[in-house]
Amino acid sequence: MKPLIVLNFKTYAESTGENALRLAMAAKQVASDSGVTIIVVPQIVDIFYISQHIEIPVYAQHIDGIEFGGHTGHVLAEALAQAGARGTLINHSERRLKLAEVDAANEAAKRAHLTTIICTNNIATTRAAASLNPDFVAIEPPELIGSGIPVSKANPEVVTGAVEAAKGIKVLCGAGISKGEDVKAAIELGTDGVLLASGVTKAPDPKEALQNLVAFV
């Protein structure tokens, strides 16, 4: 099975509004040409717009563990689903939650039939996240995020340890991923794919960067 590539748009100017749509369209084309599943994760305000223009999966960057009601400023699972999202990140290092909040968000996502990716930063948090039975965990040591130094090379033991700690839950590898060889290394360490952002979103040619990512798989 080919690996999964999850592209987090974050809140960069290069991946906001019309730029977000252009980036999503590039991901759609590369996914179609390569047969690799590419998931795009735009800002919440761009989800509906993007989901109207592409067929590849669109995920949210965050979700709150709430139900319908008086929760001003929160992100409701059902609203994401109606906007076209098929899944969501939970507990990204730039949007950290307490374990109880992670659990509530995961349950809310399941209620709305959204696929969940719980982000973790070490083996211990991976074990805790896996116990909540998400669809994926994504191991991302925060010191390597945006560094261009892939965790699969800088600290492969963290990746293999996370795979073991996840106990059957699918694992994604994040932090510093920017090249096809990084994806290949992550897969060889036992993961099911990668989570990345700036290696593509801030690349001079994002489509070319995506093509490089899938070239080794």
Describe every region a protein language model picked out.
Residues 120-133, 173, 177-194:
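Catalytic cores of alpha/beta
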Residues 10, 43, 80, 140, ...:
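Conserved, mostly hydrophobic/aromatic
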Residues 41, 117-120, 138-140, 174:
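Short, conserved beta-strand edge motifs with alternating hydrophobic and charged residues
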Residues 33, 83, 112, 132, ...:
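Structural motif
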Residues 86-97, 136-149, 189-209:
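Glycine-rich phosphate-binding active-site loops on the catalytic face of alpha/beta enzymes
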Residues 16-23, 42-52, 68-78, 93-108, ...:
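Active-site-adjacent beta->alpha loops and helix N-cap segments on the catalytic face
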Residues 57, 86, 115, 135, ...:
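Residue-level detector of anion-binding/catalytic polar loops
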Residues 1-75, 116, 124-134, 201-202:
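Conserved N-terminal beta1-alpha1 strand-loop-helix module at the mouth
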